């Protein structure tokens, strides 16, 4: 299976969520983005997403203090898995991969919306999930967000992208 994000950017797939900061439809069942505004969660629910995973810290820029309640009120499951942007750990990636494995089915029964502040942290975690759990090639696992992030990526995140299964598993 190939990441459809690059096809999305070529205009082959349209999205009702393009108004959300840095939205990328990674696979038919997984979309990623930066922090949505409160009113955008209704659009996420209307697009068929049943799970929202937030990797941002509770005190991140534009964080919504009531995000979990808002998501639940729209009939979606909310999972907050905060990852410190300054010090992501292999255990964070391992937990994320485990969570995604439990939620992401080949049948596409549930759609998963994963976000952080600007979709950088999520793109890196999705890269590892797609490579290690789904068998994507390095190229196919890369989100188009990497091109946008490259000029700003620090050594912490550049190093994280080189982690192997052994690094993540401990």
Where are these regions (language model features)?
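Short coil/turn linker and secondary-structure boundary residues
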Residues: 15, 36-39, 88, 136-137, ...
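Active-site-adjacent beta-strand anchor residues
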Residues: 34, 115-116
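Glycine-rich nucleophile elbow surrounding the catalytic serine of serine-hydrolase chemistry
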Residues: 120-124
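Cysteine-based protein phosphatase catalytic domain of the PTP/DSP
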Residues: 31-108
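Aromatic side chains
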Residues: 23, 49, 78, 96, ...
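PTP/DSP superfamily signal
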Residues: 2-3, 86, 95-111, 117, ...
């Amino acid at each position: 299976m190939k990441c459809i994000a690059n096809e999305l950017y070529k205009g082959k797939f349209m999205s009702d969520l393009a108004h959300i900061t840095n939205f990328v439809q990674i696979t038919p069942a997984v979309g990623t983005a930066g922090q949505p505004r409160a009113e955008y969660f209704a659009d996420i629910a209307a697009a068929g997403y049943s799970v929202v995973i937030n990797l941002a810290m509770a005190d991140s820029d534009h964080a919504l203090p009531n995000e979990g309640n808002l998501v639940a009120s729209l009939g979606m499951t909310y999972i907050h898995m905060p990852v410190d942007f300054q010090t992501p750990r292999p255990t964070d990636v391992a937990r994320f991969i485990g969570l995604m494995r439990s939620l992401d089915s080949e049948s596409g029964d549930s759609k998963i919306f994963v976000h952080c502040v600007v979709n950088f942290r999520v793109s890196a975690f999705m890269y590892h999930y797609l490579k290690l759990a789904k068998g994507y090639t390095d190229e196919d696992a890369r989100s188009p967000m990497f091109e946008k992030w490259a000029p700003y990526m620090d050594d912490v995140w550049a190093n994280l992208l080189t982690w192997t299964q052994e690094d993540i598993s401990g």
